[in-house]
Regions:
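Core of compact, soluble alpha-helical bundle domains
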Residues: 2-169
């Protein structure tokens, strides 16, 4: 048996017992550094985008960090968003936004997808699919919560959702 590691899939890494385990989306995206770079690019785009800038009216110094923490935790990284801010923070922030329109929700998704390459994110199909599904879900939840008039109208999610690789088809 050879001592060389056979890498079958770039999304896998060696397990300590010699078996292969799948890398988390967080690790695959480059961890905090990769996700922070991506969130910074998205945020810069949102601040000047004619459709999104009514929701992103001014630069908030902590916003990129909060976006990074949320995505990192969702993708299997540290639970910093939950520890530092608590999930209720996310609900409260979106409930105070002006009602998010369908056009804004769609543009939000498109803006994220547009910065993936510039942000140096992996271009494999499964990562891009997982990322798109994550952003689409988040945009739908944010839109619903922005329109909530009562607690009963808020999307019934009480913790940062954990995202994983899509099933192989």
């Amino acid at each position: 048996m050879s001592d060389k590691l056979l890498v079958i899939n770039p999304e896998q890494k060696p397990h300590s017992r010699g078996t292969m385990v799948t890398q988390s989306l967080y690790e695959h995206a480059g961890g905090d550094d990769g996700l922070h770079r991506l969130e910074e690019l998205f945020y810069e785009k949102a601040l000047i985008d004619p459709v999104l800038r009514t929701q992103f009216t001014k630069r908030v110094p902590t916003h990129v960090d909060h976006l990074t923490w949320f995505t990192a935790e969702s993708f299997g990284g540290p639970d910093r968003f939950t520890r530092e801010l608590g999930f209720q923070y996310l609900i409260d922030v979106h409930r105070h936004l002006e009602n998010i329109t369908d056009e804004q929700r769609e543009r939000f998704i498109a803006a994220y997808m547009e910065v993936l390459d510039e942000g140096g994110m992996p271009d494999d199909e499964r990562f891009r699919q997982a990322f798109r599904e994550h952003v689409e879900f988040g945009a739908r939840v944010a839109q619903q919560n922005s329109r909530a008039e009562t607690d009963a109208d808020v999307y019934p999610l009480h913790e940062v959702p954990h995202w994983d690789w899509p099933d192989e088809r």
